[in-house]
Amino acid sequence: MISSANQKMPSLARKKSFFGSFRRGRPSFRADTRRRRTSSTSTNAPFTRASTSSEHASLKKVVVLGGGFGGLYCALKLDALSWREKNGEQPKPIVTLIDANETFLFKPLMYELLTLDMEETEVAPSYEELLQNTTVRFVRKEATKIVPDTILTTKSGTKVSGTGGQVIVRDALTNEEERVKYDYLVVSLGAKVDFESEKNFVKGAKEFAIPFNGLEDVKEMQKRIERLKEVKEDEKTVAVVGAGYAGVELALCLARWFEREDGLKDVKIKLVAKDGELLRSATTGGKAAARKALGKASNLEILDGTVGAIERSTDGSSSSSSSNSSSSPDENTKLNIFLTKSDSSSETLENVDMCCWTVGLTAKLPTSETDWPFEQDRRTGKIITDSTLKVAGYDRVFALGDNSIQREHEKTKGKSTSEESEEKPATAQVAFQAADYCAWNVWSAINKRPLLPFRYQHLGDMMTLGNKEAAVQFPIGEEATLDGPAAFALRRLAYLYRMPTNEQRVKIGSKWLSAIRANPSAFVEEVIEGVNSYTSRK
């Protein structure tokens, strides 16, 4: 625990908690409440001028790229650390968070946002709101290039740097560029849906499929679903491609939502699963809970196959739609999805109204070496870091989350014998934990203290099953899984705890409590109905 001017490495709590408040190997911080003030967050105003004033000239500048779980939580942890400004320790640095979006997205609750069970302000609050009680600055721009002040090339050809540098950022509206100076840099840009690489390319997918990875994707799906309500046809079909967590959760949420929504009760959902396999990384208990829920959804069918191509249907499109398969889709477009099954036979899904795409995520990084000087893993394209999350060869740059991969050196009698890259799961849980370590290590680097190796502690997995049901897989065995309404409540509480700020927790928690207090009998009836529904489905 950071408890004195002569700070030591964080204590390693031994008590495990599903909510993550105490974790083996997780740094424990004490908030710096002495210097807290209203943040100078701004989406438009230049901030570099402030950093050149005499007041701030000597302060270190920490720039965090990416405002997802890794980047935002790292910036908040840096702000909460104790910066004592005595005994040789450095004063609190200027922390700047840069992201191209105006809002943070709590991705595990995207499903509730899609089905209108939660509001946008609950799932996607603005950065300005989240940072208003911190000293973290926010700039809404896109990072396009990183220019270290100095780069040396070793005899082996490896690039190294021990200095700060500049990030070139671009305004999406004006296309104007600006240079942001950093002494220390954190890269946490997350993942994007890849439609174009040789590995993930599927003809027609980029033009006709809707990815499920961001706030705009959710809004586009809602718009298409509203349009589906108005379609007067006997058969309406929604395809969900991918049967990992995102695909299974999305399919179940849509199925349970459509069952009770007028105008959508006749929609059929097709879940396309490679080799017919569901939730490859889930436990036995988690897979069983998902299969049970999927099996009870009368409007949902699981299909074995991989998508080979998507084309505009020539016989099912409305009269307002062109039959040209290469043109952009409109709200009336019908699609044909061509599948290759595990036995190499073919199947075609005809006249599909909407195709939801949950596969093909890749690191969100520039591909040009001149724009992005860091070494990247050949297989995944992710930035290579050591165990402390420090980027290989760059003493003042750290990376975490979906855009990084750790490379471990196996040693025998003190000598490095081999290298092995360890890819952590691309989940919010990993980024949530890594943010603590990254913030601590930035503090340590600034104050010339030892860095702490990141050790991920798996705390189990949670998934929604739709309509106030969920499954929680505990990290104590393959069968230890809780599902149903109780798991739904536990999942809600866990995510409430993991909200980025206390203000956001209070905002959401008070709203849930207010809804219960306003109509307690309806709440009790809803719980009883959920339990009875779950019991009848078992």
What are these regions (language model features)?
Residues M1-D32:
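N-terminal chloroplast transit peptides
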Residues S17, R34-R35, F47-E55, L59, ...:
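FAD-binding core/adjacent interface of flavoenzyme oxidoreductases
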Residues S53-R140, F201-A205, A239, E249-T284:
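Beta1-alpha1 glycine-rich phosphate/pyrophosphate-binding loop at the start
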Residues K92, N133-V167, R256-S387, G393, ...:
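A Rossmann-like FAD-binding core segment of flavoenzymes
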Residues A205-K232, S319, S323, E350-Q433:
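FAD-site-proximal beta/loop scaffold in flavoenzymes
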Residues Q222, D234-A293, L300-E301, K424-A445, ...:
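Rossmann-like dinucleotide-binding core of oxidoreductases
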Residues A434-K538:
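C-terminal, flexible cofactor-proximal segment of oxidoreductases
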